[in-house]
C-alpha cells in the first residue's frame, strides 16, 4: 500500500480550513487579557525591555511573544487594508454584497490571526508524528491512522483553534526534536528542543528523558557542540528583548525566572486529576499540611520524582530504543498531569501525541488514546463551557461522572505502565508490532 501524497496534501489543507473555520467562532479570554496586550505593547514600544515593562503578567518565553507580535502586525497590515477596501466598495457600489463586510468584520478576526501560529503548529505536530510513525512501523494503515488522528483530533482543535492556546507549538518542536535524534541529526534536534522550550516551558518535564538520549546518542564532540549551540539559541532568541542595562546572562536568568516565578498554588487548576478527585474542585492551596510537615505540593513532587526515576531506570535498561522513548514520555507526562498539584486542564495535551504513537507498537493502545482524547476534551470543556451545550455541561459538573472518568484515566496510566515494564522488551516489541492490522 503506497501513500498518495496528493491525498495527504488534500487532507492537510482540509484540516487547515477546518481549524480556521472553528477559530472564527469564539476564543478564550486569555487572548484579550494577555496575548493581544503583549503584542500591542511590543508593536508600540518594541521588543527591548518587554519583560521589565510587563513584569507582573509576562510569563511566556520570547518565541511565543514574537509570534503574537507578528500575527498582530499581519492583522494590521494585511487585514485592515482589505477591510477598508471592502467598506469602500460597500459604500460606493450598490450591488456589492454587504454581508461580506459583516463577515470580514467579525469580532473574532483578530483572535483568528493570534491563533495562527498554534493552528500551523498543529499541522507541524501531525507531520512530525507521521515521520516518527514511519520509523516505528512499515504498516501504512497505522501510519495514516496516526496522521489523520492528529490532524482531526477534536481536543487539539479545541485547544488551538477555538480556545486559542499555544500548547502545540512547543509540542511540535519536541516531536521533531525526537525524530531527528533517531535520524542522527543531533544538532538539529537540540535546536528544535531549545525552540520548544523557548515557546513554552510545559515540555520541560521531558528533559530527563531527553537527557538520557543525549547521553547515549550524542558523541562527545556533539555533546560539546550541542551545549554551546543551545546557549547560543537561547541568547539569540532573547536578544531582541534585552535592554541596554541587561547583562550577558539576561537570557538565562529571565528564562529561569519565567520557569519558576509564575503559576497558581492550587491543588488543581481545573485539571481532572487525583487532587480534583480527592478534594473539592474549589480553589484550595497546595501548601496546607497533610501529615506533619508534609504538604500536598511536597507529596506530589516526591511522587513525580519517584515515578520519573523509575521510568528512566527501565528506559535505560531497555537501551533507549525509539519505542521505549515514546513509552517513557507518555508515562512521565501523564503521571505529571494526574498526580502533580497546580496542573491546568491543558497540561494533559503533551501526553496525547506520544500515546497516539504507541499505536505503531500495538493497535490496542489506540483505544487508550481515544479515551484520553475524550477525557481531555471534557476537561477542556469543563473549564470554559463553550460552545454551550447543557447536556455536556451538566456531565462535566456532575461529581460522580467526573470522578468516574478520572479513575478510569488513572487506571489507564497503570495499564500503560504495566505493559512498559512487563511487555516492552525487545522481543515482545518485535512480536507485537502492529500485529492486529495487516498491510
Task: Describe each PLM feature range.
Residues 1, 183, 205-232, 242-246:
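Perimembrane helix-loop-helix junctions
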Residues 1-21, 26, 134-135, 143-145, ...:
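Start-transfer (signal-anchor) and selected internal transmembrane alpha helices
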Residues 15, 135, 247, 259-338, ...:
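Aromatic/glycine/proline-enriched transmembrane-helix motif characteristic
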Residues 23, 243, 252-263, 267, ...:
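Transmembrane helical bundles and short interhelical boundary loops of multi-pass, membrane-embedded
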Residues 33-66, 70-87, 246-256:
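Extracytosolic helix-loop segments that constitute the early lumenal/periplasmic catalytic or substrate-binding loops
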Residues 90-104, 108-137, 176, 306-315:
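Transmembrane-helix motifs of polytopic, lipid-linked glycan transferases
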Residues 127-131, 156, 169-186, 354-355:
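Specific aromatic-rich, kink-prone transmembrane helix
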Residues 147, 157-158, 174-180, 187-212, ...:
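Membrane-interface alpha helices of multi-pass inner-membrane proteins
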